[in-house]
Amino acid sequence: MNIGLFFGSFNPFHVGHKIIASYIRDFTKVQQVWFVVSPQSPMKTKKSLLDQHHRLMIIKMEIEDNVNLDVSDIEFGLPTPNYTIDTLLYLSEKYPNHNFSLIMGDDNLNNITRWKNYEKMLENYLIYVYPRKNVDMNIKHKNIHIVKDVPKIEISSSLIRRLISEKKDASY
């Protein structure tokens, strides 16, 4: 099975994540999308991070009606910090009958050269990139596929956190 891995802190998870995952599933070779909840990204601070189990449960509740979406806590049991390449290698070994690919936004693609063993990722895994804000993508590779026409949702986890801190409506 072709599994698209959508890594993130999902702090919090929102409808934009579901829309992107469903679109990638419907318009690429990905047959199922797994949201991989990262306990702590090596690229982010932990100061405002909700508990990892809480984030996992939120996603489980939000996707329970969609058999093409799943959530994984695989990184909870792996050594920290969690590096994407380590998780990919672990999953590839654990599930040899699956083909794994990555799902990421253009902002992450533009920073991929800062990731641990990014060259190995580029050589061994397809990467589906959803454009977010018309960012010029400065990296090209045969395994990078820009997914055109992904609905652009002007919502982000950081916006939701800001609205909550300002005691404004963040119900979307």
Question: Can you say where each PLM-predicted feature lies in the sequence?
Answer:
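Nucleotidyltransferase catalytic core that binds NTPs
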Residues: 1-172
